[in-house]
Amino acid sequence: ISALIAHAEVSGRLHLSHADGEKPIDIHFKGVAGVAGVTTGTAFVRQPPANLRRVKDARTDQPEHELDEFQAALGEVKAELRQISDSLAEHLARKETALFDTYLRMLEDHTLSGEVCQRIRSGETAPTALKYVVLDLVARFEAMDDAYLKERATDLMDLGRRILAKLLHEQSEHFEYPNDVILVAEDVTPVMLGEVDTQSLKAIVSIKGSANSHVAILARSLGIPAVMGAVDLPLGEISGAHVIVDGWRGEVIVEPSEHVLAEYQRAIDDAAILELDLEQIEPGAAMTADGTHVQLMLNAGPFGELSERQRSWIDGVGLYRTEFIFLARSRFPTEDEQESEYRTELATYAPMPVVMRTLDIGGDKSLPYFSIAEENPFLGWRGIRVTLDHPEIFLTQIRAMLRADSGLGNLRILLPMITTLDELRASKALIERVVLELTAEGHQVSAPEVGVMIEVPSAVYIAPELAREADFLSVGSNDLTQYLLAVDRTNARVADMFDGFHPAILRALQAISQAGKKAEIPVALCGEMAGDPLAAVLLVGLGFNELSMSSGALASVKRALGTFSSAECRFLAEQALQSESGQHVRRRVAQAFLEKQLNLLVPPNLRETLQVEMA
């Protein structure tokens, strides 16, 4: 209720100011940081093309006509997607525009088009059938716990709305965008983004969504800031307003004052200087100031390609999520289909190691063709529990991975959601069985290294035992932080409480690192912490020797690590472990960055505060 009151007050303030002919000043709206960066521009509010939820149920006695209408609408949407993909091709790598190929496959998939056609044949009109099929799929994805998979609901809803608009024969609108567009919508989608000239697009702001959404990934590739989950932003009142988008803080400021605008302009100028500075970073592996090698690994997904310079910085792939292969189909992929996908990934980075996480589904992360309903899916049947209960799924995937690795030898297998030693032992036994089977069949395969993903509190406490039987440990810092602090990081109301610098998180990380060191096995971390320069220095001090991150974070992390010695990293980590709050830890590390003249790697708000205190 308090949130609704606050929203109404802000909307009223904007409305009254507009009615009086006066501009409101410095109205702040909080969201979630989607893509770091700061910019200013003109808000352009984009409405969805049609509303599926408003479609009234109707039946038809001419199903063939409705089928023809549906197929025609489908064809028009496909043509638009191809056109948008072509327009973005000159600004994005092929792997990034490939998401539009994914959309096309979604439109052709039996789960969507097949079910719509089936309902039409049963007597429903095309709009009615489309409504029920799309809303059902959207509900399934929205129920998933995994942030990336949850975001696929937005993609499905957008495709459904576009098909509906064609079915209703609504004319495609031609929008006149300003030359400094801040694209704002309840759910900004990649297709909406693709409709705007990339030279004019300055930032995106979405009421829904998170940093894992496709549109945030595209914004990151285009180098534009994004704020997601700005739930209190009154869409009906801000179109045409001058706004600041702060992708560092996850904040939108409507009609900023001259004073605030001047402050942010300094941040914009600093960001440009930092970009030029990072472009000067030399090729080669990441090293601390005293020459200690820190392995920078890549979080690989369906999007993003590395430049030759970036490729020289990495030591391999720290996390490849195999869910993508399963989500792109209306059935379980065959062993041969999986082998082909895995082979491409392994060969791309060979001879560097590629860590492939086995299928992580179950509970709230069900596939459209493998639905699982539970009262408490967050703590239910998921991860390794599902694949051990369904060994046919696990065995097929392991067979595909090992066949793909034949002749390359750079495969590492990562097991998700391990909570007991028995789960690790059972998984390893199945992997050993596959090695023997494939060898007997004449395949040239070798036993891969098998690691455990530490992402739940129980795994932290049994890390020493897990480390004795695993070949490596890999911390999923996003989920571990969420579980330890009981904070949903995609919820804008509590997003500020999601803090990887919290002493409890750092002490858990230290325990994991020490367990790996005692067992003499590598310990990696994949998650947002690894890509944060301030956190990366702490992680090295805590003993982590592998940091896995998105390609966009490689340069800033390499720059930071090259300025601190191993001893300095350890000293900062020791201080952090004795701190009482995450805020205190962050301030202390940021202060060390300022002392090293790494000012531009410190978030602007924190940098300004510390510079005033140090003056």
Predicted regions and their residues:
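Non-catalytic, soluble scaffold/interaction modules
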Residues: 1-348, 354-361, 386, 390, ...
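Conserved alpha/beta-domain cores
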Residues: 273-615
